[in-house]
């Protein structure tokens, strides 16, 4: 879908056209990000390269690299936007928000959800840089 749809934001720079284009872009970014994240964490545990209890230390080590941290932040924000905008599209396509006023209200609510989720995810990923995650606590 991301590659088949025809974006026309240069001809018609309407808000919803931009949201349509960003939904496709963030979908691709989110797919790449989730694939990479699952490979770095769950697949490594399944292969026996990392113990499940060491995932906090692994994440600490990953976010010490500023490029990796930036990639995580971009991926998390893209996933948050993709979810929130997809929720808006779901509400419209299922006939829950039919009129212009209800669509405007749902736009504000969904974009508010995007901001809240993005802030929470960025705070969560940056917390792994805390030295407390550098090693496992005693007795674990």
Give each language-model segment a name.
Residues 1-140:
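Membrane-embedded alpha-helical bundles that constitute the cytochrome b-like, heme-associated redox core
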């Amino acid at each position: 879908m991301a590659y088949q749809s025809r974006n026309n934001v240069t001809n018609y720079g309407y808000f919803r056209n931009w949201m349509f284009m960003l939904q496709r872009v963030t979908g691709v970014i989110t797919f790449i990000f989730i694939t990479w994240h699952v490979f770095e964490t769950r697949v490594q545990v399944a292969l026996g390269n990392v113990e499940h209890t060491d995932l906090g230390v692994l994440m600490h080590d990953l976010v010490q690299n500023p490029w990796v941290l930036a990639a995580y932040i971009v991926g998390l924000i893209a996933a948050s936007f993709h979810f929130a905008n997809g929720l808006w599209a779901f509400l419209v396509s299922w006939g829950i928000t039919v009129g212009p006023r209800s669509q405007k209200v749902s736009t504000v609510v969904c974009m508010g959800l995007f901001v809240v989720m993005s802030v929470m995810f960025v705070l969560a990923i940056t917390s792994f840089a805390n030295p407390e995650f550098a090693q496992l606590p005693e007795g674990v």
